[in-house]
């Protein structure tokens, strides 16, 4: 069986190809995609050949934020899944010749391993989670990014007594702010882009600050009544920004490294010692958190639909990734609509 797939054949090149799928095995399900979302950071670094430790090689099929409908089940998978089930999955089985990659989500149909003995086997991944009835596919496909934010929030044990600063209001940072408020925390967010600041003010934050136009340190001091933040969540991926964020913390505060920090990095750890700071290093996300975020979306408690800035057909993949590489400031949520393919 063949599938349409978005492919990175080499650094900075994007193609739509027909690929031959692996055969359906006992615990596999076949999924016809509705939508998939681009992870701006992860897929940008993959496309430019800058992923760490060679975890992505070329050619590869990117994507790990996919939602679709089950159309076939292997002999054992039929005990858990039924044709017509809508699922959110991390990665599909990789077609021959496209290995060296942990993603493989931008293709339809997709062969997905649903073996419960293998799902969530490493830090909650991989996963196949059923989508709540009535939840739109394009919103459900962003649940994985919200789940990334969940991991950092869970590890930092953020609670209703906390005053939290979130630096960076891309999808992960915006979701982090909303989820912190769901836990009862008060939240100040910061970004340099007016559109993101406005979205944050409307949907995510108690206080939203444009750090190019306002004194961020002063606004944080006002927000925390001079005590400093209980938790700072960094989604900027900038160690230069981290150095500033250390000063935003109260004594014994927590700093969540929620971005990706490619080497080389320089960080003055002595400043963190002087704050008696706790550092939290989340990575990835879990099926449990994806299910939790989709449930919140269904209940109207987590709103990510307003963050979708662009929708593309798979045939427009090169145009979509041109935005990712060259005009990231214009984007937040980028969705591929596979039903039109």
Labelled PLM ranges:
Residues 1-62, 123, 208-210, 337-341:
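Short N-terminal strand-loop motif that marks the start
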């Amino acid at each position: 069986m063949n599938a349409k797939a978005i492919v990175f054949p080499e650094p900075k090149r994007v193609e739509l190809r027909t690929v031959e799928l692996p055969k359906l095995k006992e615990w596999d399900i076949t999924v016809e995609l509705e939508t998939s979302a681009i992870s701006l950071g992860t897929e940008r670094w993959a496309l430019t050949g800058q992923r760490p430790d060679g975890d992505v090689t070329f050619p590869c099929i990117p994507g790990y934020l996919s939602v679709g409908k089950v159309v076939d089940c292997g002999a054992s998978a039929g005990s858990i899944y039924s044709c017509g089930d809508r699922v959110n999955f991390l990665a599909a089985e990789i077609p021959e010749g496209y290995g060296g990659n942990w993603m493989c989500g931008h293709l339809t149909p997709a062969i997905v391993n649903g073996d419960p003995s293998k799902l969530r086997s490493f830090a909650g991944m991989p996963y196949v989670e059923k989508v709540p009835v009535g939840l739109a596919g394009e919103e459900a496909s962003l649940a994985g990014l919200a789940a990334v934010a969940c991991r950092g929030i869970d590890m930092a044990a953020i609670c209703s007594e906390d005053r939290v600063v979130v630096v960076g209001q891309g999808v992960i940072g915006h979701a982090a702010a909303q989820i912190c408020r769901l836990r009862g925390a008060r939240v100040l967010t910061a970004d340099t882009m007016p559109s993101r600041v406005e979205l944050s003010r409307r949907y995510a934050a108690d206080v939203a600050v444009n750090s190019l136009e306002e004194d961020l340190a002063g606004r944080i001091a006002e927000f925390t009544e001079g005590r400093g933040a209980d938790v700072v969540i960094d989604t900027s991926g900038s160690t230069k920004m981290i150095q500033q964020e250390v000063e935003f913390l109260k004594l014994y505060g927590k700093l969540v490294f929620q971005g990706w920090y490619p080497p080389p990095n320089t960080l003055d750890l002595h400043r963190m010692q002087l704050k008696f700071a706790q550092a939290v290093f989340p990575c990835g996300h879990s099926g449990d958190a994806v299910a939790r975020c989709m449930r919140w979306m269904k209940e109207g408690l987590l709103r990510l639909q307003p963050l979708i800035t662009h929708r593309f057909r798979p045939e427009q993949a090169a145009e979509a990734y041109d935005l990712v590489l060259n005009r990231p400031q214009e984007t937040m949520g980028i969705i591929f609509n596979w039903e039109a393919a």
